[in-house]
Amino acid sequence: HPELSLAEERTTSDIANQLDAMNIPYERPLKTGLVATLRGTAPDAYREDGTPRRRILLRADIDALPVTEQTGEEFASVNEGCMHACGHDCHIAMMLGTLQILRHMTDDIHGEIRIVFQPSEENGQGAKLMIGTGVLDGVDGAYAAHIWSEVDAGTVSCEPGPRMANTDWFRIDVRGTSCHGAMPQRGHDAVMVAAEIVNALQTIVSREISPYEPAVITVGELHGGTARNVIAGTAYLAGTVRTYGDKTHEEMPELMRRIVEHTAAALGAEAELTDYTIANYKVENDAASSERCRQAVLKCLGPAGEGHYRGTLSGEDFSEYLRRVPGVLAFVGTRNPQIGATYAQHSCFYKIDESVLAKGSMVAAQYAIDFLAEPTQEELDGPTIAAVAETNPDLAAKLRSAKATAAEARDAMHDARTARHAAIKGIHDARAAARHEEKRDE
């Protein structure tokens, strides 16, 4: 019974029933999705004021895709036109398995685990909605896993650096002059112009971006024309852009705008980049979190379980969490040709090797335990400053001041990054509005 983004009502209820059976408390801050809490019972799990000494967020997305399943499996979707073709049902299963493990190990949990069953990943809204409810308040790190059809079953890949791409959406409108299909010289063919723009856009990737930097511009829609014997007067294109590089991501709208407008002008028509929307920022694993995850894989699966994957230009809104706290996205491999588990994500034939689910659950549980067992920065710094204070109070005061300044600097850097992204979007919107006004004045 898969359900589309923001309509995951039965899915949410099913998850709630499982949590009830495990006696794990949860809240429903949104119409769909929920947030559970697992409290550690280690002696140092909570401070005297009742706050956890350390808190980690584990996230599983829960929505499906508008795809009609054709796997023929007995458990195939019964909801016409809706399928878990990206494996989010597996993410739910792995997370519930992780909780089954952890609820019997609370004495080993030196803090608190916040589990987010997130709606609406596929349309890029869910993470922002959940974060808006405060799920990242007091969180020190985040973890998520994505089953992946290009990684061998039984292995987990969690390398550092970019793992999933900046994901943007665009629309281009073309205006020509319609005329009789037998008299093309009397008009300007918007469909032909649109086709030229499709080809011209590819020169951005091949000639303006380093060949060592991954980038993709895909036109997924081209619509134009009203009749077979009429030269089309209008057409529009829609598609997606995927990038890793920050500079490329920032410059892409202007690169596309130049190509679009000049290509159309050369053919006697007009074209405009009427929409350019940032859907998701790239998912980037920090080095410390990646190494912690690698160690969890080795502990649970041994050396044979360590997978290696280059990353993908697919997008994921888990990036919204990682823009705010350190963390890791792990790829849990599902590829197994022996059982036909080779189809890519989003295919109507998509299936997985289900034996990997328990392994994914174990790695997530181990990661959470290891993360919470690590000393906090306060614990690392506190004794040192206290010891200094016994012999040199002035120096101790300076150390405390420096620590506070460093914390302020980290906050300022985060605020600056957020402001930069907002400014880029503002520039794009302002330019689009100005061009719209110019066209209207003409």
Language model segments and positions:
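Divalent metal-coordination and catalytic microenvironments
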Residues: 58, 88, 115, 130, ...
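Alpha-helix C-terminal capping segments
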Residues: 100-105, 133, 322-324
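Structural motif
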Residues: 54-57, 113-114, 140-143, 327-329
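Non-cysteine beta-strand/loop elements that form the S-adenosyl-L-methionine
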Residues: 57-59, 170, 329-335
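Acidic/His- and Gly-rich active-site-bordering loop/insert found
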Residues: 1-84, 89, 93-96, 100-110, ...
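Metal-dependent amide/peptide-bond hydrolase catalytic core
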Residues: 195-405, 409-410, 414-417, 421, ...
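Histidine/acidic-residue-rich, glycine-tolerant segments that coordinate divalent metal ions
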Residues: 35, 65-67, 71-83, 89-90, ...
